[in-house]
């Protein structure tokens, strides 16, 4: 999975002003949203705009993605009418068979990112992740998932705590990246807090629906000077301990063993 993918910004498919704002947002991936953000009567227009939108986003340094409707809905028309994207997402995936049909219909070369939006889909995350070798990541939804669970969306996200934790574990075990659900409120402070929570769970990527959230969320998922300095401290202390014949080290009162050392090395390598 080349290039940074920290932020995945969903944009209304038929809104040219939103396409331009997305290009200025700093998001790593920009998603032309043909499902919930685009009413059926505007989908033909949105598909026709895909070539210009993708060119604009690629010029800005972003990855051009699209989210289509399920194939049993308007998905086939979406695929027929859009410019080939870098990444192809599909909404409401709950079975591996849906992924297999998507792969058969998808333009060659596009990565696949199924979206998990229901309890049934969550319980089959591993099967879905293994349904195609073209899958590079999976995304877990917020609004549709909350509706399926019969609860309400809140700023603290407690209603999705189990979903987000389980989804991350399932994706990690399957060997694909996990994209966290969006924070669907406008306040930047809340978006930052939600991104920090996701990072603590183990996420490296997050979806979003507000372009003003892109740069703050990128900052959360980008190691800062203090984090890098701490990682260097861990690596140095552990390597000194190993050279002295010890199997662990201590840094700031915390025991450092192989997994923590390896994580610090990965962090430093990611910024090399």
Residues of each region from the PLM?
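Expand to "…catalyze enediolate/carbanion chemistry for C-C bond making/breaking, isomerization
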Residues: 1-272
